[in-house]
């Protein structure tokens, strides 16, 4: 089993559990250059809120889009948008990525901005 298939296997297990709970989920995906986050409805078919380092509103204050500072900016922007839509409680779906570095920075910034998970 290679690295990518192991990550996908871990992500599938977590998503199955979150779906059983019927919770709104905050999904994170990272690449070497960017990080993406979405809040997805409990039925899994609708994206309620999204933020990423591809957006000018997020990256205009950043020097580079692939570091922890960028991830924290995405987490803060996502939390603010979610709270505007009345979403305050989510389940964190790290998509099989290790809870460390950029994924952790995004989660911490979202918590500080008011999301509960």
Swiss-Prot record:
Keywords (A to Z) from UniProt: Ribonucleoprotein, Ribosomal protein, RNA-binding, rRNA-binding
A Pfam family hit: Ribosomal_L18p
The UniProt record lists the keyword Nucleotide-binding: no
Gene Ontology molecular function terms on file: 5S rRNA binding; structural constituent of ribosome
InterPro entries (UniProt xref): Ribosomal_uL18_bac-type (IPR004389), Ribosomal_uL18_bac/euk (IPR005484)
Family under the similarity heading: Belongs to the universal ribosomal protein uL18 family.
Subunit structure, as described in the record: Part of the 50S ribosomal subunit; part of the 5S rRNA/L5/L18/L25 subcomplex. Contacts the 5S and 23S rRNAs.
Entries under HAMAP family matching the protein: Ribosomal_uL18_B
Function: This is one of the proteins that bind and probably mediate the attachment of the 5S RNA into the large ribosomal subunit, where it forms part of the central protuberance.
Protein name (record): Large ribosomal subunit protein uL18
Organism in which the protein naturally occurs: Serratia proteamaculans (strain 568)
Gene giving rise to this polypeptide: rplR
